[in-house]
Amino acid sequence: NDHRKFLCKDQVLRVESTSTAWTSGFEAGQEISIVLKNQDGQYVADAKTLEALEAEGRVVFRYVGFNPNGSRNDIAGITNERGNVVGLMPHPEHATEPGFGPSSSGFGSVSLRGGADGLGVFTSVLSNLINAR
């Protein structure tokens, strides 16, 4: 990343595409909060690749408000052409249980309503697997 320091923080992402197996349970434009744990890495690509990804709707998550690692175009996650593989920097697996993930109720408080925004990634793929039978 562009600062070479370990970050562990709640991160707001915008769902850019719901056409993948991993994002079909979200709404396009929905903002979710999941955990970012990152020291190494950022999304980099040349202008032609970025243009193609954007035109093809293959950017699936984008950082909102704060780009923690200097990723080009604020990209937090992309998908392959088929939409069955998603690469994502933040960690949705750390935001799957109410009261343990990021909370919209503020620092130091426990909210049983917050903290599970990452669960949508896994329920999306589970739903797609069940429907593929």
Residue ranges and their predicted role:
Residues N1-R133:
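Amide-donor transfer/coupling interface in amidating biosynthetic enzymes
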